[in-house]
């Protein structure tokens, strides 16, 4: 009798294992979709397209990038949260969508912990602090001195209230005990244009946006908000080198799915993301934007997300930054 039970148990286990392997082998059997909550042409969008191209090659299925823009990333993120948890809908996510907005909005239509499954962190980018050409400073230290001499008068553009450029400015003010006039714009292009025309004094931006403007003499790059000097602007000293110890600011780029996808499907996605993060096309794309490849698996990304939420949640609460 005991032998019969053992045989039946073994047979049942074998069937389950074969079923799981079959599901793993069959996925994907139709096109996949990557939701991007930002407009076409930006860092998130172009990064998602590189990921999509590589996934399509590896999976042998088309991968469509769908831009669902609006509400500082909330529209696209809500759409991703409500998608079927079958592994066919992914979202390319950033600090705004998954670490800032949850603390910024009183009424948010998604919950990061409840609605999403981290798959992988792929890359991180850091800001440089750029200033208009006519501003009488040449480095971060001189900017801090000028700001302390005239509290609240020097203007700094951001991509919008609660954007990574905004919270980086707020963090910079806290660390340096300074006060600037924050001028939020509706996106990257208007903020950079305001800097270029002299409408604002400075802005935290990604280096690839302003490196050409620096070379033409239209802006100055005062410092790199990174732990080490950036490859795109190797002559620009870090904030740490200029006395603002350990200061970093920027964004990051990862991939999530709706929570509840089958474990074998998640495992296959995670495996492919690890390969993409090390692929020449992805690394070349990252290098061209001054973005650092920083792969972390699902567990590592989940831990990173928790720390990012703690960091930005505390700052947003202390500063009373909110959007109704």
Predicted feature locations:
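N-terminal (or domain-start) structured segment
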Residues: 24-114, 153, 161, 177-204, ...
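Bacterial N-terminal signal peptides that target proteins for export
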Residues: 1-11
